[in-house]
Amino acid sequence: MISGGGPGAMEATHVGAWMAGRSDEETSDALTMLQEAPSFKDKLWLETAFQVMKKYPNPTYISLGIPTWLYGHEPATPFATHIAKYFDNSIREDSILTIAKGGIIYAPGSAGTMQEIFQEAVQNHYLSFGYASPMIFMGKDYWTEEMPVYRLMEHLVAKGKYKNLLMSITDSTEDIVETILEFRSKKTE
């Protein structure tokens, strides 16, 4: 698992990797503990994370967080087992997209997320790595109304400006998992 290595949705990637292989009850307990200080702006955010890590020591699963020095206000997630910091955000984004060959899940975000979307679209269009990987947009209202990038991408595909885009949009985590597993099974056929 790889992410931008920061808080929020990026951190969720690493919490998932940290808890992989554990029971649903243990994962639920860890998430309940983390709800005590859900934002990095909360005074006990880091302490709460360390409590979860102590209660549920990391097994052999690894994850890579790649934060950037550019966003000094966002701390790196403590759940990433490996950290690689970049000075240049565009190189950082390209590195993440190059490594993440199994698909990208786009949670509501800001400028960096927008950059990732269009960089991934170009990589998929040109089949830079020999195939296109799924672009999964999490949050229908956000990606079609508040930040209508999904509609723009659909329009560009319809006009022939982009090819090879495997896009989906959903509010369901189950749909996200199904999309990734389906892609993975087709890739190994």
Regions found by a protein language model. Name each.
Residues 2-11, 109-114:
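Gly/Ser/Thr-rich loops at beta-strand to alpha-helix junctions
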Residues 96-98, 131-189:
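C-terminal functional extensions of proteins
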